[in-house]
């Protein structure tokens, strides 16, 4: 570079200050610039668009959409360029600036000026050495404050949210250096800050960015510029050359600036602008010819007018996301519409007036300045590990919490009440207890035999006088007739004074002071009174006491229930304080704050009680204000106190966070002093500034002064809507009524609002401005969970004072995540979008960003909590608004939305482990779908099923924890019954779970169709006739006996129920495993059993309740029809004959004790053990070595009876005999008592010794070697197996087939538990199709009890042809959320003589009990090799199928086999003939 050029460039080098990006305008360097699409005609005459002055800026700010040559580009919002101070530098030097920073740190910047085509170098050196020193920087281009990211950042540079770069300094001794190379001639300056990340320390230029102006090639040609239409044309040609790709916003910007750079370089090389225009225009000859026919007329319409029309079309269409081609078409369609108007003779002036009527001009202008249309902006979500948001904070189980539900100690007055009520019988009319300075006053009214009798009693010790009268109408004081005066009364003028006397009722340990008044005369309606004690008058809160004779209190008749499942004492305390709480929000919030510690001691149910109370308040079920004036600042202070205590609980007790969040959502944020006072002051300023001091505004002012409430937020919004609708009063009432405020409610306020608003047109602008500002003040106190208010509180704001009105300054929350304010800005700008995908992503990214801050103490924690609650709620609102967007969406988009809502739900729960694994499952399903995996829909269906189970579990939690408190407290507070009944339902609807459930319902049929699953899964295909009966759950009717063939439609089937007698079919929406107990019994008993996935089919079946249906199943479907006429009688008798047949041949043979307490597997015979033990012994030594058989011993038949007859168990035997007699008298409660009694048996020494010997000789561990306690555990497990003979399911099953229950004998098979990776059940003939050439199997993770027991969800299921065992085919992926895992242990299996009888399905009726309790583990299938590794899956499933074939071949018949997989090896633990 020559010295002259260098000096010239360096003379122009500027080092300037700009506002630091996080504090700058909305689209400064922290936020991606928004753009719009506008049409520009390349060869448009200069004056063509000047025919009408545009309401929009015609200056070009970035890229645009060309109508010709059709290039889609963006446009930046114009920003105010702040004046910059110039730093003078030595013209002969490349030193651009030198600074002394805080702490004697020196910063030096040098710039190397380029020659044409070379790089510009910026060297930044700081006398500060740190391994964590970063340059936070970006570049300025085209005089815009918005940062761009240069294409050649130094090594190690990271991109921060596509908004800034962070480059590490290189340490050199005591200094640190960074060298930047800029190759884009359009870049005019570099801006930066320096950050010591480890210290969180920023180095700034007097609080702003350092700004280094760069020398540029453009400085050599200052008098030459490139016309924007040529840049647009060049950008289009680049776009066309690259195949008309759809660009992201960032790519659009880069392409546009690259086009500009190319043209600038041409000019530097000496090409004139005219030559460039000719060159570019020639390249567009083809397009010119194509469009020549309409070119002249198109150019007659200003492009900015076309732009407005295209925006209106886009908004009318629901703001869809358009592709590049669609954008072009839309723009041309808008031009055609306008051209059509012109051809009708309408002038451009008239079109301008028409389409810019009302607010459309401002609205479009704002939209074009700040937003893209045709394409929604997106934030770049960070890649996160879902496990980072895992919560496992589980509240202590209610039953373990020391919550007393015993009746509290009764006061003397309550004891008096009880005794009096018992004495007087059912004639009680009215009862009330008043609180008097720590004592109680009872008033009890009853009418025995037509008389009116009043009892008054108090536990006060001081002498007390009742000053009273009677009344025949309200408010009257009449002297009573002398005949009714109690002894010792003094008759005065118009009243009586009677002294309370000490009295005691029988069996009452306390004395009380009481009065009894008896009135025989009719006509009196009540008794007014006051009390006198020690010369002082005592009133009822300033009024007379009044006893109503005619009012029959509902509370006297109300059954309050026993308060079970609630923090009963706390709820009763709340109910007792409600009279005080009704005075004002200040009273209510202070009372709630006083109760927080008591709620904490009561645990989860305590906070549930507070939540229910606050929810009743928020839904206007409780009185907000009654005869009490309170200043707004007093309300906000009380809110502040309550929310401070709640935030402390949130930190100290993470297990209650979910409930605390819900409580906070019902309470405003509050605030000390000024925030609340502003409500009172600002309304006066609004009235004064806008000259509206009378009418409705004055009435509202009086209400605000005396008792502001959340209703005021709605009233303010209603006024704004009224003004915006051009003073349409119906808009005012619509907003009020939509939010639950009626005329009656307005009139019910202590300071009633009688009038409607009536403003003048000249007040419009001022009122909209001032009421809009006032809304922020109201929301700051009352609407903590309002999104706009919550964002404002977090980012800070300042409202200036005016005269007497105080100012308010809320500081920004410190240490927010980098870029977080811009993220909130994005959310604010897009919150009204109809296409909600980008908004949902922004809301969830914001929640993820602040989550770490919510887990630690922070002085502004509650502001962050209210923000998080608002963001969570906005997700729900957005998805409800976005349902329309999903109408035509494919499964991938619906799955993505499901994952977003699921993430939102997981971020709010105390225990979200199950949801996290569902979330990971959806992520896998999306990946499989995008990669076109064969089984993606099948896998996604399993994740959907599991997600539904998780939602059902959450609903059960609400029902268990909240509903009992709602019912008990609702009864105590006389809340409307409908509000109590739907309490849980409304709480669920208020969260994301309901929206998620709706999306799952929409996705389910899509997945079933894609995976070819159909509407049914037929578990037992039996053709039947039967009458339809609808039940909630099969368990509730398993003991019932139907006297006609019945088709049960059961909402819930767990899997271990018994099928009721007389049932010919069970149809359910639930999903029991195909090989669960109930499924096996259905097949064995020839009962049709199927799951229906289609709610419409289920609804149709339910509509036929009471009618007879004919079910005709195939292996994959069920056809059904209503049976009518003569067919009805024939089908009924056919069913009954079929049902009565087989049971008569079933019989049991009584087994005897054979003299041995324990035997080894070599000694297993039919006389000693059941088929389960014999079959496992038969396999030993016969199966291939790759199939393991566990070592077994047994306690044979007769041991139970022998132990019971031992002298040490005489008392147990006698008690059992009595209970059996009770059972014989049809008292089925004896079954439970029998089981409990069996567990009291003691083990004879001989049994212990024999069992020990046989187990050790077989190589099994003896529990007693680990201590006596371990043997006791084993003995208890043995007794539980014996006791299961009397479980309800087994007892009714044997009785149904007329088996003699006394003949049923129970051996116990003892096996060592194999700590399994997986458990499986095989049916060697496919049970659904009956295909003997095909094996069907189910596999679960962990122990097999989750497969055969009542554990929700489905197992992995597969089939495999016996002639192709290496090719298993997966039918369904697992959805079971829980796996059971156990330490090395012993299992004691039931082995009765009644399990495998021909014609009787006895398998699975009795219990197998492990010595140790299995651990429940929430399963993560995304890390399970059986699901994710195709080769491993094929290997394991093939081995299971091969084992099934081997065992079937050994027995020569179809088998029902149970086994486990451990470290890839197959173990078979039992087998029986497949029935």
From Swiss-Prot:
A Gene Ontology molecular-function term?
Answer: ATP binding
Name the UniProt key words of this record, in alphabetical order: ATP-binding, Carbohydrate metabolism, Chloroplast, Kinase, Magnesium, Metal-binding, Nucleotide-binding, Plastid, Transferase, Transit peptide
**Catalytic residues (UniProt):** 1077
Q: Which reaction does it catalyse?
A: [(1->4)-alpha-D-glucosyl](n) + n ATP + n H2O = [(1->4)-6-phospho-alpha-D-glucosyl](n) + n AMP + n phosphate + 2n H(+)
Q: Which Gene3D superfamilies match?
A: ATP-grasp fold, A domain, ATP-grasp fold, B domain
Q: Report if keyword ATP-binding is assigned.
A: yes
Q: Name one GO cellular component term.
A: chloroplast
Domain of life of the source:
Eukaryota
Q: What induces it?
A: Down-regulated upon carbohydrate starvation.
Q: What does this protein do?
A: Acts as an overall regulator of starch mobilization. Required for starch degradation, suggesting that the phosphate content of starch regulates its degradability.
Quaternary structure per UniProt? Homodimer.
Tell me the PANTHER family matching this sequence. ALPHA-GLUCAN WATER DIKINASE 1, CHLOROPLASTIC, ALPHA-GLUCAN WATER DIKINASE 1, CHLOROPLASTIC-RELATED
Name of the protein in question: Alpha-glucan water dikinase, chloroplastic
Its lineage reads: Eukaryota, Viridiplantae, Streptophyta, Embryophyta, Tracheophyta
């Amino acid at each position: 570079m020559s010295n002259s050029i260098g000096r010239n460039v360096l003379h122009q080098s500027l080092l300037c200050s700009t506002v630091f990006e996080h504090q700058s305008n909305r689209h400064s360097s922290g936020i991606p610039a928004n753009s719009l699409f506008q049409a520009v005609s390349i060869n448009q005459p200069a004056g063509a668009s000047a025919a009408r002055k545009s309401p929009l800026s015609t200056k070009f700010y970035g890229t645009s959409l060309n109508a010709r040559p059709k290039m889609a580009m963006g446009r930046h919002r114009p920003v105010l360029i702040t004046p910059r101070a110039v730093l003078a530098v030595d013209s002969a030097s490349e030193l651009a600036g030198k600074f002394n920073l805080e702490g004697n740190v020196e910063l030096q910047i040098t710039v190397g000026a380029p020659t044409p085509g070379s790089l510009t170098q910026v060297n930044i050196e700081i006398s500060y050495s740190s391994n964590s020193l970063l340059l936070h920087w970006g570049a300025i281009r085209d005089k815009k404050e918005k940062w761009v990211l240069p294409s050649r950042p130094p090594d190690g540079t990271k991109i921060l949210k596509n908004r800034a770069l962070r480059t590490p300094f290189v340490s050199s001794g005591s200094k640190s250096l960074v060298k930047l190379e800029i190759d884009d001639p359009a870049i005019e300056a570099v801006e930066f800050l320096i950050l010591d990340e480890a210290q969180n320390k920023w180095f700034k230029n007097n609080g702003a960015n350092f700004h280094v102006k760069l020398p540029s090639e453009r400085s050599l040609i200052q008098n030459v510029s490139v016309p924007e239409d040529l840049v647009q044309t060049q950008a289009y040609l680049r776009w066309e050359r690259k195949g008309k790709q759809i660009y992201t916003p960032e790519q659009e910007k880069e392409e546009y600036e690259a086009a500009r750079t190319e043209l600038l370089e041409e000019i530097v090389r000496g090409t004139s602008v005219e030559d460039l225009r000719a060159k570019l225009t020639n390249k567009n000859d083809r397009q010119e010819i194509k469009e020549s026919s309409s070119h002249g007329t198109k150019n007659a319409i200003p492009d900015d007018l076309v732009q407005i029309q295209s925006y209106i079309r886009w908004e009318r269409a629901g703001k869809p996301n358009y592709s590049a081609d669609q954008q072009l078409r839309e723009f041309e369609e808008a031009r055609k519409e306008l051209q059509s108007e012109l051809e009708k003779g309408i002038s451009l002036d008239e079109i301008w007036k028409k389409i810019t009527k009302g607010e459309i001009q401002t609205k479009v202008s704002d939209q074009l300045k700040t937003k893209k249309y045709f394409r929604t902006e997106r934030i770049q979500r960070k890649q996160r590990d879902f496990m980072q948001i895992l919560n496992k904070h589980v509240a202590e189980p209610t039953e373990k919490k020391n919550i007393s539900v015993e009746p509290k100690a009764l006061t003397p007055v309550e004891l008096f009440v009880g005794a009096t009520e018992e004495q007087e019988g059912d004639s009680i009319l009215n009862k009330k207890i008043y609180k008097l300075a720590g004592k109680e006053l009872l008033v009890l009214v009853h009418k025995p035999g037509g008389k009116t009798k009043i009892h008054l009693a108090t536990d006060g010790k001081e002498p007390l006088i009742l000053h009273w009268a009677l009344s025949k109408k309200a408010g009257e004081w009449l002297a009573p007739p002398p005949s009714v005066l109690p002894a010792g009364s003094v008759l005065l003028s118009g009243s009586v004074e009677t002294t309370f006397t000490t009295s005691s009722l029988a069996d009452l340990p306390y004395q009380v002071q009481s009065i009894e008044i008896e009135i025989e005369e009719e006509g009196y309606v009540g008794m007014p009174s006051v009390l006198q004690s020690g010369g002082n008058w005592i009133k009822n809160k300033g009024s007379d006491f009044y006893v109503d004779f005619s009012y029959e209190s509902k509370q006297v008749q109300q059954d309050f229930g026993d308060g079970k499942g609630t923090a009963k004492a706390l709820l009763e305390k709340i109910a007792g304080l409600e009279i005080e709480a009704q005075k004002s929000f200040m009273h209510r919030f202070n009372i709630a704050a006083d109760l927080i510690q008591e709620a904490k001691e009561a645990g989860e149910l305590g906070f549930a009680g507070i939540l229910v109370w606050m929810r009743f308040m928020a839904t206007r079920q409780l009185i907000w204000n009654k005869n009490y004036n309170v200043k707004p600042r007093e309300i906000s202070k009380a809110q502040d106190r309550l929310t401070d205590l709640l935030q402390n609980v949130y930190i100290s007790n993470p297990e209650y966070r979910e409930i605390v969040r819900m409580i906070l959502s019902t309470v405003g944020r509050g605030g000390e002093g000024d925030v609340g006072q502003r409500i009172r002051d600002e309304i006066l300023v609004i009235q004064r500034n806008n000259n509206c001091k009378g009418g409705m505004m004055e009435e509202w002012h009086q209400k605000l002064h005396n008792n502001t409430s959340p209703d005021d937020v709605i009233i303010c919004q209603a006024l704004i809507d009224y003004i915006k609708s051009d003073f349409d009063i119906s808009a005012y009432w619509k907003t009020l009524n939509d939010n639950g405020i009626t005329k009656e409610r307005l009139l019910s306020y202590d300071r009633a609002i009688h009038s409607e608003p009536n403003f003048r047109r000249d007040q419009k602008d001022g009122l909209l401005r001032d009421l809009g500002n006032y809304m922020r003040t109201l929301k700051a106190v009352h609407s903590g969970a309002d999104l706009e208010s919550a964002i404002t509180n977090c980012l800070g704001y300042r409202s200036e004072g005016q005269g007497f009105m105080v100012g308010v300054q809320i500081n920004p929350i410190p240490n927010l995540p980098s870029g977080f304010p811009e993220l909130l800005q994005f959310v604010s700008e897009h919150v009204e979008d109809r296409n909600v995908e980008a908004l949902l992503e922004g809301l969830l990214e914001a929640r993820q960003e602040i989550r770490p801050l919510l887990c630690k103490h922070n002085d502004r924690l509650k502001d962050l909590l209210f923000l998080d609650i608002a963001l969570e709620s906005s997700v729900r609102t957005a998805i409800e608004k976005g349902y329309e967007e999903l109408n035509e969406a494919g499964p991938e988009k619906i799955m993505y939305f499901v994952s977003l809502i699921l993430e939102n739900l997981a971020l709010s729960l105390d225990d979200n482990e199950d949801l996290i694994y569902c979330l990971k499952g959806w992520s896998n399903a999306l990946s499989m779908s995008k990669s076109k995996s064969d089984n993606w829909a099948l896998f996604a269906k399993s994740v959907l099923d599991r997600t539904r189970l998780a939602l059902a579990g959450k609903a059960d939690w609400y029902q268990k924890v909240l509903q009992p408190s709602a019912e008990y407290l609702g009864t105590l507070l006389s809340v409307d019954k409908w509000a109590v009944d739907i309490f849980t339902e409304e709480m669920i609807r208020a969260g994301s779970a309901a929206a998620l459930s709706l999306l799952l319902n929409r996705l389910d049929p899509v997945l079933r169709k894609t995976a070819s699953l159909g509407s049914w899964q037929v578990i037992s295909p039996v053709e039947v006739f039967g009458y339809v009966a609808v039940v909630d759950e099969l368990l509730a009717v398993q003991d019932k006996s139907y006297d006609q063939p019945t088709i049960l439609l059961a909402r819930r089937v767990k899997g271990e129920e018994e099928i009721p007698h007389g049932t010919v079919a069970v149809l359910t929406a639930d999903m029991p495993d195909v090989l669960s107990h109930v499924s096996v019994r259905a097949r064995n008993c020839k009962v049709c059993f199927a799951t229906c996935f289609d709610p419409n089919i289920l609804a149709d079946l339910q509509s036929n309740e009471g009618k007879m249906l004919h079910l005709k199943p195939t292996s994959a479907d069920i056809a059904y029809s209503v049976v009518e006429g003569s067919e009805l009688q024939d089908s009924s008798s056919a069913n009954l004959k079929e049902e009565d047949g087989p049971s008569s041949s079933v019989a049991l043979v009584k087994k005897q004790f054979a003299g041995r307490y324990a035997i080894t597997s070599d000694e297993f015979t039919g006389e000693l053990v059941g088929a389960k033990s014999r079959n496992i012994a038969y396999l030993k030594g016969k199966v291939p070595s790759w199939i393991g058989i566990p070592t077994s011993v047994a306690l044979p038949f007769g041991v139970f009876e022998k132990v019971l007859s031992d002298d040490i168990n005489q008392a147990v035997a006698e008690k059992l005999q009595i209970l059996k007699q009770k059972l014989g008298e049809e008292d089925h409660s004896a079954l439970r008592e029998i089981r409990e009694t069996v567990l009291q048996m003691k083990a004879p020494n001989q049994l212990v010794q024999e069992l020990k010997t046989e187990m050790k000789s077989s190589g099994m561990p003896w529990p007693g070697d680990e201590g006596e306690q371990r043997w006791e555990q084993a003995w208890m497990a043995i007794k539980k197996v014996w006791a299961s003979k009397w479980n309800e399911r087994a007892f009714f099953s044997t009785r149904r087939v007329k088996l003699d229950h006394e003949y049923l004998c129970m051996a116990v098979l003892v096996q060592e538990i194999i700590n399994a990776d997986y458990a499986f059940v095989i049916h060697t003939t496919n049970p659904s199709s009956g295909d003997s050439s095909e094996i069907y199997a189910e596999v679960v993770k962990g122990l097999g009890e989750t497969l055969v027991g009542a554990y929700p969800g489905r197992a992995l299921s597969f089939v495999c042809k016996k002639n192709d065992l290496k090719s298993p085919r997966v039918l369904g992926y697992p959805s079971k959320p829980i796996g059971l895992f156990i330490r090395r242990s012993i299992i004691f299996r039931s082995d009765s003589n009644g399990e495998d009888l021909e014609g009787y399905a006895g398998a699975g009726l009795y219990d197998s009990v492990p010595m140790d309790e299995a651990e429940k583990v929430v399963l993560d299938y995304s890390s399970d090799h059986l699901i994710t590794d195709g080769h491993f899956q094929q290997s394991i499933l093939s081995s299971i199928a091969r084992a099934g074939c081997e065992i079937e071949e050994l027995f020569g018949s179809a088998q029902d086999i149970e086994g486990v997989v451990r470290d890839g090896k197959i173990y078979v633990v039992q087998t029986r003939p497949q029935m």
